[in-house]
Amino acid sequence: MAWSASVRGLGQRVLACSRELPGAWRTLHTSAVCAKNRAARVRVAKGNKPVSYEEAHAPHYIAHRKGWLSLHTGNLDGEDHAAERTLEDVFLRKFMMGTFPGCLADQIVLKRRANQVDICALVLRQLPAHKFYFLVGYSETLLSHFYKCPVRLHLQTVPSKVVYKYI
């Protein structure tokens, strides 16, 4: 009996102390740690893995052997809204992947010129022409109304995925 009374008293003292410390209730994190380190390049296999030109070169070759996949002035010194443009880029890429499911042959290139957004992509010839034209018009119209600026899709069709080399 005396033991339970002392434990109860200890618990009340801990609660009293934690109420005095601001933020003491929010310091315990119970989520699992996910510390994965991965290089942003394709792993070398047995020579049977097809890769595109963008995937074949490591990220440190940007502006030397390969170009940027998002062209805008948001990252220049003194420019605002770089984070918003990055989120817009992620949304546009996911929108295009969902609108053309399994039809994109390579990465999408996003270009911002003044008040216009240009989306350039290689598309596989898996859809009939009338469905393809409908999806292009649907995407341009919906994105133009959403971003309140002209959005143009510049798409090229290819018969199969373009393979640069096998790794």
Swiss-Prot record:
GO terms, molecular function: structural constituent of ribosome
One example of a Gene Ontology biological process annotation: mitochondrial translation
Transit peptide residues according to the UniProt entry: 1-35
Cellular localization per UniProt: Mitochondrion
Residues in the signal sequence: none
Major localization listed first in the record, in broad terms: mitochondrion
Stored InterPro entries: Ribosomal_uS3m
Coiled coil regions in record: none
Domain of life: Eukaryota
PANTHER family per record: MITOCHONDRIAL 28S RIBOSOMAL PROTEIN S24, SMALL RIBOSOMAL SUBUNIT PROTEIN US3M
Subunit field text: Component of the mitochondrial ribosome small subunit (28S) which comprises a 12S rRNA and about 30 distinct proteins.
Family in the record: Belongs to the universal ribosomal protein uS3 family.
Protein name, UniProt field: Small ribosomal subunit protein uS3m
